[in-house]
């Protein structure tokens, strides 16, 4: 709603921060990587009122308790490898979120990446970097979660999940065909995507997962 304060943790090069700031929201952005900070600053204009700082998602001590209406975690859980760090990240996001505020969590989905990679490499199933018994991907610095693992992580972190979304579905796998679509077909494709993206039976069939939650 108008006047909401948003914290973008792991803001990358600023795509989400800039979008919301230019919609009139009060945005604070925190990013760790030097290259991303530099890219973000290049996009800023004098009209962009964004509090951009360099910092770590595991330490949000610069922000007061219950100071944001919306907290975005659209990157850190792609890269944090051990559960203690993941839970620390979630705990800090909860701490700075107002009671009744919303927290958005993004994950890279483990299970569909196999088909996406197969689209690039016909031999992926024999030579891909994954556990051939459990089908758990190994591609650090990227970290992958199944739908079940993401749910458990958030539940263990005291998050009440409100929405679960297959963010991009098969869009990378089908990118070449999608790029050939007419505007009319693409509009209908998007309608189809939004029709299926929260269906429980299809949640794992995506490269990225999005969860919206609130503090329990």
Where are these regions (language model features)?
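Class I SAM-dependent methyltransferase SAM/SAH-binding core
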Residues: 15-59
């Amino acid at each position: 709603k108008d006047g909401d304060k948003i914290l973008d943790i792991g803001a990358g090069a600023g795509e989400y921060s800039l979008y919301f700031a230019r919609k009139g929201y009060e945005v604070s952005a925190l990013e760790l990587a030097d290259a991303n900070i530099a890219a973000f600053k290049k996009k800023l204009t004098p009209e962009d009122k964004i509090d951009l700082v360099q910092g770590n998602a595991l330490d949000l001590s610069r922000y007061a308790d219950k100071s944001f209406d919306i907290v975005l975690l659209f990157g850190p859980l792609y890269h944090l490898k051990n559960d203690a760090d993941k839970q620390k990240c979630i705990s800090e996001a909860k701490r700075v979120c107002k009671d009744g505020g919303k927290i958005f969590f993004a994950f890279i989905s483990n299970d569909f990446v196999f088909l996406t990679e197969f689209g690039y490499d016909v031999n992926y199933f024999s030579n891909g970097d994954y556990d051939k018994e459990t089908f758990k991907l190994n591609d650090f610095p990227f970290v992958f979660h199944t739908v079940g693992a993401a749910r458990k992580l958030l539940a263990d972190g005291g998050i009440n999940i409100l929405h679960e979304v297959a963010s991009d579905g098969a869009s990378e796998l089908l990118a070449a065909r999608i790029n050939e679509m007419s505007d009319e077909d693409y509009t209908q494709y998007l309608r189809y995507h939004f029709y299926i993206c929260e269906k429980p039976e299809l949640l794992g069939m995506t490269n990225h997962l999005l969860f919206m939650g609130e503090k329990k």
